[in-house]
């Protein structure tokens, strides 16, 4: 059995697209991520009951990735919180919360920490204070802590792998990390070494640069983790 869980994103751009999605295509995914930021706020709330009904047999991670962290939606703090609160009424397995961008929303949702993937995304670099950021996020006691960063050199990828390993050994196996882009692909399949417990794989369109397909990810992890 693989140790690393595979998360497969769904990125819908209009309400009608949901009907065309085949649930069976996602049957081997451990977790289905609804990347809702390709819709408007109103469309998200309209689609939610249909989405959760369609994927009622799946573990769902709800993600509203904002422009500031590399996503496609720009909303106020109030609207961000409103959407997450509404989504929580459908009892998703997990919700992504952008800790450094939407701290007030995190504070308002602390009762749901057991469902939270507390996240930080940096599409420009691997910040020098990444370890401190990870520790700060870990101290909030959420289910998982996730970071995705952009390497500029090979050593940036190796640094991320080492930081992830150090954090896992010190604080436990609830960290998710990845270096984006082609340069960072190794980080997506090395969880068995670093302790990163989830990886994100694409079915069709990737949700982040450097993402590997579901079929390829399954094949590689089956070799590395058996």
From Swiss-Prot:
Keyword check for Lyase: yes
Pfam families reported in the protein's UniProt record: DHquinase_I
GO BP annotations listed: 3,4-dihydroxybenzoate biosynthetic process; amino acid biosynthetic process; aromatic amino acid family biosynthetic process; chorismate biosynthetic process
Domain of life of the native organism: Bacteria
GO MF annotation terms: 3-dehydroquinate dehydratase activity
Enzyme Commission number(s) from the entry: 4.2.1.10
CDD domains assigned to the protein according to its UniProt record, in alphabetical order: DHQase_I
Catalytic activity: 3-dehydroquinate = 3-dehydroshikimate + H2O
Pathway given in the UniProt record: Metabolic intermediate biosynthesis; chorismate biosynthesis; chorismate from D-erythrose 4-phosphate and phosphoenolpyruvate: step 3/7
Keyword annotations: Amino-acid biosynthesis, Aromatic amino acid biosynthesis, Lyase, Schiff base
Record has Lyase as a keyword: yes
Entry binding sites for 3-dehydroquinate: 33-35, 65, 188, 207, 211
Active-site residues per Swiss-Prot or TrEMBL entry: 121, 146
InterPro entries: Aldolase_TIM, DHquinase_I, Type-I_3-dehydroquinase
Subunit note: Homodimer.
Purpose of the protein: Involved in the third step of the chorismate pathway, which leads to the biosynthesis of aromatic amino acids. Catalyzes the cis-dehydration of 3-dehydroquinate (DHQ) and introduces the first double bond of the aromatic ring to yield 3-dehydroshikimate.
The family this protein is said to belong to: Belongs to the type-I 3-dehydroquinase family.
HAMAP family referenced in this protein's UniProt entry, alphabetically: AroD
Protein's UniProt name: 3-dehydroquinate dehydratase
Record gene name: aroD
């Amino acid at each position: 059995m693989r140790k690393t869980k595979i998360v497969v994103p769904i990125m819908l751009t209009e309400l009608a697209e949901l009907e065309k999605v085949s649930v069976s295509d996602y049957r081997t995914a451990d977790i289905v991520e609804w990347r809702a930021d390709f819709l408007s706020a109103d469309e998200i709330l309209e689609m939610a009951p249909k989405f959760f009904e369609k994927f009622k047999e799946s573990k769902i991670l709800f993600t509203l990735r904002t422009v500031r962290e590399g996503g496609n939606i720009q909303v106020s703090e109030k609207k961000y919180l409103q959407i997450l609160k509404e989504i929580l009424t459908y009892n998703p397995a997990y919700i992504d919360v952008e800790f450094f961008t939407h701290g007030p929303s995190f504070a308002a949702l602390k009762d749901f920490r057991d469902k939270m993937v507390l996240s930080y995304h940096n599409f420009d670099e691997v910040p020098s204070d990444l370890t401190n950021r990870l520790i700060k996020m870990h101290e909030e006691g959420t289910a998982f802590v996730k970071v995705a960063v952009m390497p500029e050199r090979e050593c940036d990828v190796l640094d991320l792998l080492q930081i992830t390993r150090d954090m896992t050994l010190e604080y436990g196996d609830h960290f998710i990390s990845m270096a984006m882009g082609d340069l960072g692909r190794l980080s997506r399949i090395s969880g068995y070494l670093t302790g990163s417990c989830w990886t994100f794989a694409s079915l069709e369109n990737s949700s982040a640069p450097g993402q590997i397909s579901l079929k390829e990810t399954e094949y590689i992890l089956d070799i590395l983790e058996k």
